[in-house]
Design a protein with these regions (language model features):
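Short, well-ordered beta-strand elements within core beta-sheets of diverse protein domains
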Residues: 19-26, 41-47, 132, 241-244, ...
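N-terminal Rossmann-like NAD(P)+-binding subdomain of aldehyde/semialdehyde dehydrogenases
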Residues: 1-118
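Conserved C-terminal structural/oligomerization subdomain of aldehyde/semialdehyde dehydrogenase
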Residues: 13-22, 205, 242, 296-297, ...
């Protein structure tokens, strides 16, 4: 089942297969209206004080809390996220608004330089209308983690959301309007690929931010580059989760299961390749399989369920093909490996063992509830295996040796390293990757400055 046709985007409940809504693609005139509104909104918004913008963020956070259950239910219905996790996404998004409202203004203060007598400073100015192309897996968080700092910097934000979460896109826009966000400062348009190209090439778009697949990011990045538009790309990941012999086994297994199966495995920065030192490999594998088997799968609106359906039917088919290919290549299937028969787009929690670097499960991103376990001979071997990937988003190390962990972190080719804990995005730290995981950073002051005109102001230079 596709989530789009030539004429419209389809919102389909993956737990039932029921079509929730069909929304026509925006035509050229509607896209022109969205661009015009965003451009006029920017002209006014950039003149507001940072304090005013920060208050708007606080108001957005409050509005999100007021509509928390409604928003969570929409997320769960449209993309299948277990309801407890959907509620947590709303809570995290509201907290993001508060964090930037409190800490962001200071990050926009003029920055001193080493020029004598403070004659030169760096100013962070608004850039313009930012086009955001966002995915379905965190339909609220992914939008706001870019939009909140973009708005605080004085830019306007124009969203093109994933076609299977148009209900979430509409609700986000409604909540921000209710919070008092001025017209044109935040907008969204249901654009298809041609519409996206129209917007990227329009001179009113100053920059583009994309979270999505490598293929989509490369295509959009190429268009943005041809138009000389700045672009931030947050793309795929096949993150290594290293477990060394001296690791706290119970803690490592708990983090591994949470890190792999949250959001039914549909997380770009999730642990996907479990690289375990051979002295602890069997014990880790046994406990991991038992813990994964104990996860409850079913209706994502039922509180007790840990795993819901995969969001898209085509991606379940692709994942199953990757699992089958890996088994044919020699991987050992320890758990799952099958589509769940009946209503809904469910895929069993799956564990593959004896995975080697030449196999599909090691080389490709597995975007679903599938874990691949690879045995490393020693720590240096584990490090080499971790870096043997075209991706470089995040990595995890479990060890009792803090010195070794720090040394390994310095040599891991990725944007984030988590020691004795699984990866996550957090407003307080930068998020992003290297290699084919993309470039640029979101969150913290890095995400705030990404879409600023970093302007040098130098007085009395002779």
């Amino acid at each position: 089942m596709t989530m789009m046709t030539a004429t419209q985007a389809l919102s389909v409940n993956p737990a039932t297969g029921q079509t929730l809504a069909a929304m026509p693609w925006a035509n050229a005139q509607e896209i022109e209206h969205a661009l015009s509104l965003a451009a006029s909104g920017f002209k006014k918004w950039k003149l507001t004080s940072v304090a005013q913008r920060a208050q708007t963020l606080r108001d957005i956070g409050q509005a999100l809390r007021a509509h928390a259950e409604e928003m969570a239910q929409c997320i769960t219905r449209e993309m299948g996220k277990p309801i407890k996790q959907a509620r947590a996404e709303v809570t995290k998004s509201a907290a993001l608004c508060d964090w930037y409202a409190e800490h962001g203004p200071a990050m926009l203060n003029p920055e001193p330089t080493l020029v004598e007598n403070q004659q030169a400073v760096i100013e962070y100015r608004p850039l313009g209308v930012i086009l955001a192309i966002m995915p379905w897996n965190f339909p609220l968080w992914q939008v706001l983690r870019g939009a909140v700092p973009i708005l605080l910097a004085g830019n306007s934000y124009l969203l093109k959301h994933a076609p299977n979460v148009t209900g979430c896109a509409q609700m986000i826009a409604r909540i921000l309007t209710e919070a008092g966000t001025p017209a044109g400062v935040y907008g969204w348009v249901n654009a298809n690929n041609e519409g996206v190209s129209q917007m990227i090439n329009d001179p009113r778009i100053a920059a583009v931010t994309v979270t999505g697949s490598v293929r989509a990011g490369a295509a959009i990045g190429a268009q943005a580059g041809a138009a000389l538009k700045k672009c931030v790309l947050e793309l795929g990941g096949s993150d290594p989760f290293i477990v060394l012999n001296d690791a706290d086994l119970e803690l490592a297994v708990k983090a591994a299961v949470a890190g792999r199966y949250q959001n039914t495995g549909q997380v770009c920065a999730a642990a996907k390749r479990f690289i375990v030192e051979e002295g602890i490999a069997q014990a880790f594998t046994d406990r991991f399989v038992a813990a994964a088997a104990a996860l409850k799968m079913g209706d994502p609106l039922v509180e007790e369920n840990d795993l819901g359906p995969m969001a898209r039917f085509d991606l379940r088919d692709e994942l199953h093909q990757q699992v089958q290919a890996s088994v044919a290549e020699g991987a050992r299937l320890l758990l799952g490996g099958e589509k769940i028969a009946g209503e809904g787009n469910y895929y069993a929690a799956t564990v593959l063992a004896d995975v080697t670097p030449d196999m599909t499960a090691f080389r490709q991103e597995l975007f679903g509830p599938v874990a691949a376990i690879t045995v490393a001979k020693y720590a240096e071997h584990a490090l080499a295996l971790a870096n043997d990937s075209e991706f470089g988003l995040s990595a995890t190390i479990f060890t009792a040796d803090d010195t070794l962990a720090a040394e390994m972190a310095a040599r891991l080719e990725c944007g984030g390293v988590f020691i004795n804990g699984y990866s996550a995005s957090d407003a307080r730290v930068a998020f992003g990757g290297v290699k084919k995981s993309g470039f640029g950073r979101e969150l913290s002051h890095f995400g705030l400055h990404e879409f600023c005109n970093v302007q040098t102001v130098w007085k009395n230079r002779v």
